[in-house]
């Protein structure tokens, strides 16, 4: 049973009438451009064919009822006429409440809604299940009430909800790609202007995501430390963000910087340049160059930004040994565990899967999870 059929059936059973709309918003994987988003830089993600799906209908009052199919059909209910506050027990409900609350601040011309939510974006894998949920809820209200909001505004609203209501720091990339993703394309995003450019993906290439299943423990504290180090670097150059520093300017004075800060800055500057070049390589179908850029990105994250772990490095090495210069592989996401992403000719996927199955657990004691994805369409009706 598809997520659409599942949520429609649950909706009819729970609320006693049929849903009028079904909306989806996808998760994402970032192909290249790591930790560049909060430095006003470039990222190159694609939406994937794992998504949050919501069957829904407008109400003629100001009540919101939400059922979470993936959390034992827990039900949350709140009113648009009262101040929206955090739910005491259901963390999932706070993503919904946050999106609705921040949408009220942008455009208060919507009424109540009934929703049933389900999704298959793996949670805790760094594939943006939370952004997918935020964008899906925003799109529900936009579609049901014909709100004059575009995808970028729905994305910004989701980011605000996560930062201010849920209380989790995040850049804008995850929500933007979920809202604006394009089938068979990646999206080059300028995180300063929020300008986007669709980049066609070569035919016959699979997007493979492998979860190391190494439990991320340092990610929060270390993430904040990296942000502070980048801000220190930008201040040294008297610029608003590292986006505004050239590699030549950096090389001329790198010896004057704190050595750790210098390494962090070098990663951001080189990663930004790699990301822009990667978009061109992809568009030209140059998988060999894309693979080189992904390898350089991984080495930079490992040696300069220091956010990889041995388990992730092992996974990357296993995959690279199989694909050689026919594709690319690197860690993706915040670091300290999580996933790797690989661009692999479809005919090599079975060999990669076999090599990883034979070697990764033997070397690390952890079993991986393997996902083969397609670059998919952003949020909308399904």
Curated annotation (Swiss-Prot):
It catalyses: alpha-D-galactose + ATP = alpha-D-galactose 1-phosphate + ADP + H(+). Keywords: ATP-binding, Carbohydrate metabolism, Cytoplasm, Galactose metabolism, Kinase, Magnesium, Metal-binding, Nucleotide-binding, Transferase. The record marks 28 as: Transition state stabilizer. GO terms for biological process: galactose metabolic process. InterPro entries: Galactokinase, Galactokinase_bac, Galactokinase_CS, GalKase_N, GHMP_kinase_C_dom, GHMP_kinase_C_sf, GHMP_kinase_N_dom, GHMP_knse_ATP-bd_CS. PROSITE patterns: GALACTOKINASE, GHMP_KINASES_ATP. One of its GO terms (cellular component) is cytosol. This is Galactokinase.
């Amino acid at each position: 049973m598809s997520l659409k059929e599942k949520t429609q059936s649950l909706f009819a059973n729970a609320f006693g009438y049929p849903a009028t709309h079904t909306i989806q918003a996808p998760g994402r994987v970032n192909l290249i451009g790591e930790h560049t988003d909060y430095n006003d830089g470039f990222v190159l993600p694609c939406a994937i064919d794992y998504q949050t799906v919501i069957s829904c209908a407008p109400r003629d009052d100001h009540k919101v009822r939400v059922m979470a199919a993936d959390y034992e059909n827990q039900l949350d209910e709140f009113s648009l006429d009262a101040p929206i506050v955090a739910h005491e027990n259901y963390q999932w409900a706070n993503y919904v409440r946050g999106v609705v609350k921040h949408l009220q601040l942008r455009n208060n011309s919507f009424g109540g809604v009934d929703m049933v939510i389900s999704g298959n974006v793996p949670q805790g894998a760094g594939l943006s299940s939370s952004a997918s949920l935020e964008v899906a809820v925003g799109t529900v209200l936009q579609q049901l009430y014909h709100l004059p909001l575009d995808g970028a505004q729905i994305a910004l609203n989701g980011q605000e909800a996560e930062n201010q209501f849920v209380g989790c720091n995040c850049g804008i990339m995850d929500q933007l790609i979920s809202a604006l993703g394009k089938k068979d394309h990646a999206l080059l995003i300028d995180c300063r202007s929020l300008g986007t450019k669709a980049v066609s993906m070569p035919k016959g290439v699979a997007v493979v995501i492998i979860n190391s299943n190494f439990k991320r423990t340092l990610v929060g504290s270390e993430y904040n430390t990296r942000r502070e180090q980048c801000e220190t670097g930008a201040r040294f150059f008297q610029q608003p963000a590292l986006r505004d520093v050239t590699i030549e300017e950096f090389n001329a004075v790198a010896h004057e910087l704190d050595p750790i800060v210098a390494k962090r800055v070098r990663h951001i500057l080189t990663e930004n340049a790699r990301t822009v070049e990667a978009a061109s390589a992809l568009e030209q179908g140059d998988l060999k160059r894309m693979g080189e850029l992904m390898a350089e990105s991984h080495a930079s994250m490992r040696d300069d930004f220091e956010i990889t772990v041995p388990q992730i490095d092992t996974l990357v090495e296993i995959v690279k040994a199989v694909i050689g210069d026919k594709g690319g592989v690197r860690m993706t996401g915040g670091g300290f565990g999580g996933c790797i992403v690989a661009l692999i000719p479809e005919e090599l996927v079975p060999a990669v899967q076999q090599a990883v199955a034979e070697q990764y657990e033997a070397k690390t004691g952890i079993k991986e999870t393997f996902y083969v994805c397609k670059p998919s369409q952003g949020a909308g009706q399904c």
